[in-house]
Amino acid sequence: MQGSVTEFLKPRLVDIEQVSSTHAKVTLEPLERGFGHTLGNALRRILLSSMPGCAVTEVEIDGVLHEYSTKEGVQEDILEILLNLKGLAVRVQGKDEVVLTLNKSGIGPVTAADITHDGDVEIVKPQHVICHLTDENASISMRIKVQRGRGYVPASARIHSEEDERPIGRLLVDACYSPVERIAYNVEAARVEQRTDLDKLVIEMETNGTIDPEEAIRRAATILAEQLEAFVDLRDVRQPEVKEEKPEFDPILLRPVDDLELTVRSANCLKAEAIHYIGDLVQRTEVELLKTPNLGKKSLTEIKDVLASRGLSLGMRLENWPPASIADE
């Protein structure tokens, strides 16, 4: 019962009529006038375009190079086979993509039940016909890629991005990921006590069997609620940008002097002066290095050339050297 004239009614009756395992009617009432169409249209659009699911995206058929061809001993042409594969209802657990195989020979229909798959894959409608073999010696072998996605993605959207690496004979298929095949809603009159201007929303939908209709409605409502959360609190809810911290020093400065691959004489002279890292070395001047016992002009020239090849030089000034990671060693 409504508490005040400004308080909105909330639906108090939900009736779910399960016509079949893939077909159901969901009734929601009472709704304020106009809310039947508001909610019905929003849920319908989400159910048709935004529900996640699995679909066939690529097919390879032995002996077939392109979709505008036929295969000997097969009643259907390749385009019709691809169209039949689009209707394959597959449920995949724990993976974003799987590759299924199909091998069949001899006269008769080729159905989804002939597909070989592992335990993570369930073929919901094994009786679904893919093609017909018309000769005893006829056979067909194919590899079918099934991917997880959302909504509808035409093959043309993937052609340009995959053209360079797509081998000849790999056929792209328009992917309809949504498990909802048909949905319609109707708004009828509802009554609560003396109010007769209320709405009753009736949603009728059919799925491909990979999801229960009731669960589909629940997921669509969850998606809608999550999208509307930002409007509940209109303050800036953007996530703070995580700034990538730049290293205090060039990583090459933290490497040991041994990485410069100096001659044994030059390397030993530097170690005797406690110059262990490249960062230690570049802060020394030519005059300072020439004062090092046994380090002459030839060794100095070698050191300068090696540093120059790495974009470094002697006499550099490094603030806050050494870093904590080196100082603690």
From Swiss-Prot:
Residues 1-235 are annotated as: Alpha N-terminal domain (alpha-NTD). SMART domains: RPOLD (SM00662). Coiled coil: none annotated. GO terms for molecular function: DNA binding; DNA-directed RNA polymerase activity; protein dimerization activity. It comes from the Bacteria. GO terms for biological process: DNA-templated transcription. InterPro entries: DNA-dir_RNA_pol_insert, DNA-dir_RNA_pol_RpoA/D/Rpb3, DNA-dir_RpoA, RBP11-like, RNAP_asu_C, RNApol_insert_sf. Keywords: DNA-directed RNA polymerase, Nucleotidyltransferase, Transcription, Transferase. One of its GO terms (cellular component) is DNA-directed RNA polymerase complex. The N-terminal domain is essential for RNAP assembly and basal transcription, whereas the C-terminal domain is involved in interaction with transcriptional regulators and with upstream promoter elements. Belongs to the RNA polymerase alpha chain family. HAMAP family: RNApol_bact_RpoA. This is DNA-directed RNA polymerase subunit alpha. It comes from Cronobacter sakazakii (strain ATCC BAA-894).
